[in-house]
Amino acid sequence: MASTASEIIAFMVSISGWVLVSSTLPTDYWKVSTIDGTVITTATYWANLWKTCVTDSTGVSNCKDFPSMLALDGYIQACRGLMIAAVSLGFFGSIFALIGMKCTKVGGSDKAKAKIACLAGIVFILSGLCSMTGCSLYANKITTEFFDPLFVEQKYELGAALFIGWAGASLCLIGGVIFCFSISDNNKAPRMGYTYNGATSVMSSRTKYHGREGDLKTPNPSKQFDKNAYV
């Protein structure tokens, strides 16, 4: 019962993390920078994995898509690949988890389902590592440029998408670890066994009682013979 509850918790945590990781791909604010005026913010610069934009004080945004993939910076290409891999691994991990959970009716025996659940945990861990690496790589580039005194271009700060990605990656890692430990709970489950004591004769208590009663009522022929001998 405890193993089933832990699998359900792991599934909910992992799916929540996968949804958060997936939501970072279309999110706009991976990095953001603002130009403040004397009274209001005059412009906001932001970018994600696909485009860079600027929004003026009236709320009008002008965006520019990134050029060809071969002309992109290496860290953006790496982040794209890692985040897409994280989303794909999370999708397959959710399928394996549904098959391997004890509360589902597919997957075969309990031993086979435990192995599938462990595989789902490994896949979710890989998904979390990919997402964590991609977000950390992007954040490292931002912080390096921000604290570089020789960098004269527009400096950015960490956007909301990075924190969402880190949170989703952490949930995927936690859920994957719980899935992996669920197989050890299945191995610790007690087995019902029966011991063989050999063939034994069975006699009911009623039969024994009647047998004893018959023995008590049976007269001794030797005693009757002795009495008749003296008549």
Curated annotation (Swiss-Prot):
Belongs to the claudin family. One of its GO terms (cellular component) is cytoplasm. It is a multi-pass membrane protein. Forms paracellular channels: polymerizes in tight junction strands with cation- and anion-selective channels through the strands, conveying epithelial permeability in a process known as paracellular tight junction permeability. In sweat glands and in the thick ascending limb (TAL) of Henle's loop in kidney, it controls paracellular sodium permeability which is essential for proper sweat production and renal function. In renal proximal tubules, it conveys selective chloride over hydrogencarbonate anion permeability which is required for renal chloride reabsorption and salt homeostasis. Residues 102-115, 182-231 are cytoplasmic. One of its GO terms (biological process) is monoatomic ion transport. It comes from Bos taurus. Can form homodimers both in trans (interaction between CLDN10 molecules in opposing membranes) and in cis (interaction between CLDN10 molecules within one membrane). Interacts with CLDN19. This is Claudin-10. One of its GO terms (molecular function) is structural molecule activity. Residues 22-80, 137-160 are extracellular. It is found in: Cell junction, Tight junction; Cell membrane. It comes from the Eukaryota. The gene is CLDN10. The keyword Ion transport applies. Keywords: Cell junction, Cell membrane, Ion transport, Membrane, Tight junction, Transmembrane, Transmembrane helix, Transport. The chain crosses the membrane at residues 1-21, 81-101, 116-136, 161-181. Pfam families: PMP22_Claudin. It catalyses: Na(+)(in) = Na(+)(out); Li(+)(in) = Li(+)(out); K(+)(in) = K(+)(out); Rb(+)(in) = Rb(+)(out).
